Amino acid sequence: MADWNPSLYLQFDAERTRPAADLLSRIAHLQVEHVVDLGCGPGNSTRLLRAAWPLAAITGIDNSPAMLAQAAQALPDCEFIDADIARWRPAQPVDVIYANASLQWLADHETLFPHLVAQLAVNGTLAVQMPDNWQEPSHTLMRQVADEQGLPDRGRQPLLPPDAWYDMLTRQGCEVDIWRTTYFHPLASHQAISDWLQGTGLRPYLAGLDEQSRNAFLTRYVELLAEHYPLQCNGKVLLRFPRLFIVARKIDV
């Protein structure tokens, strides 16, 4: 798959950063020495972490060279590492592991989340936000277009139910807070929904397509979006975007 496009991703910087700030607001740590931002992207979430803990050592982890270059340019006082989140291990336990809209791309959460908790210091926090929109029209329509055009379903899998996360993390000695927030983003058009998702959810479907096939996919996708997202009185469309939040504090080892 082609590398991520930071410019495309940041076209919707405010909308993407808002849940990152909401997640950060629920972390109770006051004294933090080391923070890790898993899937840091272009550094929009890392910037919030630096503002919250100006004296902490902050490390951003991503596997996109383009995203890491953007983040390093924006935040020269943070460390950025090209690494696989599933295999990442810090040199010493971490106070806060923060993952905003990144872990949904990884498989086998039943193995991944206990692995991440194991990297926390006692009283450390794992803070995670993941899009929970697998059943939203924005995503069901991707699968519909792929099926219509004879393409494989390359989208990510649905998230586990909240009770599964709760049991998984409490078994790891964590105190767990889980909630779900639905954002309603006013966007300029149905094309804007497509533009947003070309930076994230549509990427696996578009990967490897030639220009003609890509254009056919996106044209059909926007047609279907228009059927499912009515225009508001001011001509905008409201993109419903549910997100799942998990904050787990490690209180036992």
Swiss-Prot record:
GO terms for molecular function: trans-aconitate 2-methyltransferase activity. GO terms for cellular component: cytoplasm. It catalyses: trans-aconitate + S-adenosyl-L-methionine = (E)-3-(methoxycarbonyl)pent-2-enedioate + S-adenosyl-L-homocysteine. Keywords: Cytoplasm, Methyltransferase, S-adenosyl-L-methionine, Transferase. Its main location: cytoplasm. InterPro entries: SAM-dependent_MTases_sf, Trans-aconitate_MeTrfase, Trans_acon_MeTrfase_C. It is found in: Cytoplasm. Pfam families: Methyltransf_23. GO terms for biological process: methylation. Its EC number is 2.1.1.144. It comes from the Bacteria. Belongs to the methyltransferase superfamily. Tam family. HAMAP family: Tran_acon_Me_trans. NCBIfam families: PRK01683.1. Catalyzes the S-adenosylmethionine monomethyl esterification of trans-aconitate. This is Trans-aconitate 2-methyltransferase.
